[in-house]
Amino acid sequence: MTTAEYLAERRRIIDRVLEENLPAAETQPTSIHEAMRYAVLGGGKRIRPILAIAAAEACGADYEPLLRYFAALELIHTYSLVHDDLPALDNDDYRRGRKTTHVVFGEALAILTGDALLTEAFSWLSRPTGDPGRQLRAIVEVATAIDSTGMIGGQVADLEGSGAAGFSPPAGGLKAAAPLERLEFVHRNKTGKLLTASVILGGLLGNATDAQLDALRRFGRAIGLAFQIVDDLLDQEQTSEQLGKTAGKDAAQGKLTYPGLIGTAAARTRVDELLAEASENAAIIGGPVNYLAPIGRYVCERRS
């Protein structure tokens, strides 16, 4: 199976799980459930749950009983997008090639939609599974990845760096750090930690050894940073139609980017270095079916 075929098949599987397990649009109150389904089911690469599947497969596990846990990662990712698109944050009108949730349903319902998706995700993650100890470790891993020292912290640091209206960061700390240090902090936290938690979730529920978990963590850290550097490059190179979201917004908002700080060529070199690091660790994990390195290449070579 080629990488493209693997990704397409796993994406269809995740889409089915999401479709079947999200509350039906007819469930009262219908407005919130319509908005949740609109936000989640409107496309997307499903990279986070696919990485979890790939990690579990590499560890020799049957991923089918674990799909709902892995699909929860997409709920978390979508919650972050719904909130990130709000006027108070990135103020974006388009996501995944169509109008953002707050444009269609209003800001108040969009906020509640994000809240509901995050809550639903942890409901899915906490359903009983084979090994309660490993499941608890997995839940803590995901929760820590998105807390104020993870994804939320990265979002705050991103706001601090953008000079957002009404947002006055304290002196010192990240504000005093070198620009590249601040940017790496944003990327590793806002995007990278949930990607890392995705492969760790797959490993923990897939009965990975400690050595495999260590390699998965190194793989995730490398791919997480590479993913966001590629996003920086695409933001300046692709059109809004190609990206499915507004292009060029980071530069327009005065945000730090890798090509803006070190140039396009050096940014691409850094992506290549991170891909090599990820591939090296994917090989350490081994396994009968291991698509981690090919997925890493896809992440680094994607055009949207």
Segments predicted by a language model, with ranges:
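Mg2+-dependent prenyl diphosphate-binding active-site environment of isoprenoid biosynthetic enzymes
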Residues: 13, 22-281, 287-300
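N-terminal amphipathic/basic leader segments beginning at the initiator methionine
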Residues: 1-23
